[in-house]
A protein has these predicted regions:
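Boundary at the C-terminal end of the N-terminal hydrophobic targeting segment
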Residues: 19-21
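Charged, compositionally biased non-catalytic regions
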Residues: 177-246
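Domain-length functional cores that host ligand/cofactor binding and catalytic or interaction surfaces
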Residues: 23-188, 290-292, 303-456
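Glycine-centered secondary-structure boundary/capping sites
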Residues: 218-219, 265, 441
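Short N-terminal edge-element motif at the start of the domain
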Residues: 228-309
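Bacterial N-terminal signal peptides
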Residues: 7-16
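Positively charged n-region of N-terminal signal peptides that target proteins for export
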Residues: 1-6
């Protein structure tokens, strides 16, 4: 069987691009998916439209699919979905063993390069099913946990949490001892509206433009304690495939996203810092555990001014918002609300911001001007997708995340009393796209209309 399959794939990959038939590519794609499945290679971000493995989808693309009403818009949607499939499938293929009986990583890459354009060209948008992205909540947990009752009982604790986090913004902040700064951009960033001249009016910077944007708006990270677990670092995998944080190489992991607000598609810049642990504050600390982090997101208006910032930890916890635009008013939100920063924050288009973290908890307690007098170390920017294909000491490739989008080693004790709220393994670190940000109600960090939910 393997010999027949390998012969078919070898024949397929030997054909020139113009000679590939639809059925050849469909057969090759099916064989690749089966090879990945047999190898136990999965990725929660690599979702595809059912029946169309060459079309990658996420919450944003599912939203855009409904917005694509003209032929040019529909054609652009297919291109975007195909580009996502290329990204996802090539990352999955990197994790195939070199001695795989069906596909090597190189063979899989060649198949994708040859066949994705063929399959995209023959896709009829009108026949596609609407993309449905499952939410990150487990309904059965809420049913088993008598959610209506437990959500009501949790109201007091949620209110206490809001008061505690708001108080941290007002109380005297710890004095920073060291800060980590991004590289200075070599070129001025492009305004999002200059790269949104396409049928769907989405800001789509090219790689060089995106890098300039990421560098320009990147924050300085200030820490008040320099013990190892309070220092950001590069994520690496050890011999046991367990993640370790290399603090000798400070890094922020970046990705772009989009939100829809007031009739426009807005560009968002995401920055993720990783720490080795949240240490215990006493033996009953249910929030402590291996790995911790911070995600800082910058939402840009079409002219490049900042509309607002928001932040979470990689568990999806501690959602906080930091308005910049004076016209923003917090909406009446159902369920538990994000914590609102009590002061207006400066626009990172005009000045670099510093994020001051509380020691050990890594709570963000201040957003301030940069202190030029502090000892400063540089950090580098890395594509967050590299976390989905990390090199291992034995030469193979693995992922930080499991098939469900979680980092299992980061599980927290809080999962034992928060499970009735429907968030699987509450407190564990999660992959982008899996960040549930509310215990009461259902809300996700990557919802396409989250800005419209947050603000009037």
């Amino acid at each position: 069987m393997y010999a027949i399959r390998n012969g078919l794939i070898a024949l397929l990959l030997s054909l020139p691009l113009t000679g590939l038939a639809d059925t050849d590519c469909e057969t090759g794609f099916f064989a690749l998916q089966q090879a990945l499945k047999r190898a136990g290679i999965h990725d929660a971000q690599a979702k595809t439209l059912p029946g169309y493995p060459h079309l990658g989808v996420n919450r944003w693309l599912a939203f855009l699919q409904q917005q694509a009403v003209t032929v040019p818009q529909q054609q652009q949607w297919i291109r975007l979905a195909t580009a996502k499939a290329w990204r996802d499938q090539t990352l999955l293929a990197l994790r195939l063993p070199e001695d795989n009986a069906t596909f090597t990583p190189q063979a899989a890459h060649s198949l994708l390069k040859a066949c994705l354009p063929v399959l995209a060209a023959r896709t009829d948008f009108s026949t596609l099913p609407q993309a449905q992205i499952p939410d990150s909540y487990a309904t059965w947990l809420r049913v088993a946990g008598l959610y209506p009752l437990t959500a009501w009982l949790a109201t007091g604790s949620i209110n206490d949490y809001h008061q505690e986090m708001t108080a941290r913004f007002r109380e005297p902040a710890p004095q920073p001892r060291q800060q980590f700064a991004p590289p200075v951009g070599a070129s001025a960033p492009v305004a999002p509206n200059a790269v949104a001249r396409n049928p769907l009016h989405i800001p789509l910077p090219d790689n060089q433009q995106l890098q300039a944007l990421m560098q320009h708006y990147a924050p300085v990270l200030a820490v008040a304690d320099t013990q190892a677990w309070n220092l950001p670092g590069r994520v690496e995998l050890d011999d046991a495939h367990a993640p370790v944080i290399n603090t000798a190489e400070p890094v922020t992991y970046t990705w772009q996203s989009w939100t829809h607000f007031r009739g426009q598609h807005l560009l968002q810049l995401n920055y993720q810092f990783w720490f080795s642990q949240r240490p215990k504050n006493g033996w009953l600390d249910s929030y402590a555990g291996t790995l911790d982090g911070l995600i800082w997101r910058v939402t840009l208006k079409p002219d490049g001014q900042v509309l607002f910032y928001d932040s979470i930890h990689p568990c999806g916890c501690y959602h906080k918002i930091y308005p910049v635009d004076p016209t923003l008013t917090l909406a009446q939100i159902k369920g538990d609300k994000p914590v609102l920063y009590s002061e207006r924050v400066a626009d990172a288009r005009d000045q670099r911001l510093a994020l001051l973290l509380e020691p050990n908890t890594h709570y963000l307690v201040r957003v301030t001007r940069v202190d030029d007098g502090l000892p400063t170390s540089p950090y580098s920017l890395a594509d967050a997708d590299t976390l989905r294909a990390l090199p291992l000491p034995d030469g193979s490739v693995g992922s930080l995340f499991n098939a469900g989008g979680l980092v299992p080693i980061s599980k927290r004790g809080e999962r034992f009393f928060l499970w009735p709220m429907g968030v699987p393994s509450a407190g564990a670190m999660r992959q982008p796209g899996e960040h549930a940000v509310a215990f009461k109600g259902r809300r996700h960090f990557d919802e396409p209309t989250l800005a419209e939910t947050l603000f009037e």
